[in-house]
């Protein structure tokens, strides 16, 4: 039987490792481009793992770390140029809420079916992340988005979907869905060891 103190130490260690992984992926993920149009982001995978293994607050923490590290990347300069408060609020809120919601969904479904719980959490994370990003774009950056959309001759909605969401969301969603069985395996191995 694992003692309460040991279990807390293991969780803290796991959270520290996942925090480091999120930081590295958040920083270097922006340098991996898909056809020059979108940046690949793998940070939501350890966010889902942390949210499932350590709880919703750990997921929120990991999402917040991802957002905070983004501020150190070259991509952040564009958004800061539009609105510093808007960028800070949008980026931190989308990461924190993605991790929190993923953890809450996992916790809600875990007792019924762990496989469904992890896949659902892996879907919820990028949906919330992208949804909050779009809301932030409308609230804080709408004038700029309108100008960009007009220059392309398309609607604001089409511009948001094509240029700001586009392949990045599809990649994040598919990556999370495809790696869910791996995440589930990690969960099962950890459960057997406890």
Regions picked out by a protein language model, each given a short descriptive name:
Residues 108-131:
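Internal alpha-helical transmembrane segments of multi-pass membrane proteins
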């Amino acid at each position: 039987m694992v003692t309460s103190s040991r279990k807390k130490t293991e969780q803290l260690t796991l959270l520290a490792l996942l925090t480091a992984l999120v930081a590295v992926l958040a920083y270097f993920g922006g340098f991996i481009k898909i056809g020059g149009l979108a940046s690949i982001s793998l940070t939501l995978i350890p966010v889902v793992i942390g949210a499932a293994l350590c709880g919703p607050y750990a997921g929120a923490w990991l999402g917040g770390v991802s957002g905070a590290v983004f501020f150190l990347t070259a991509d952040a300069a564009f958004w800061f140029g539009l609105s510093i408060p808007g960028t800070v609020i949008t980026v931190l809120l989308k990461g924190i809420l993605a991790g929190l919601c993923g953890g809450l969904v996992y916790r809600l479904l875990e007792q019924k079916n762990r496989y469904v719980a992890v896949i659902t959490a892996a879907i919820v994370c990028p949906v919330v992340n992208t949804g909050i990003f779009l809301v932030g774009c409308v609230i804080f950056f709408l004038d700029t988005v309108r100008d960009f959309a007009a220059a392309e001759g398309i609607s604001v909605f089409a511009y948001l979907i094509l240029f700001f969401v586009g392949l990045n969301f599809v990649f994040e969603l598919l990556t999370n869905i495809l790696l869910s069985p791996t995440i589930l395996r990690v969960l099962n191995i950890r459960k057997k060891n406890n």
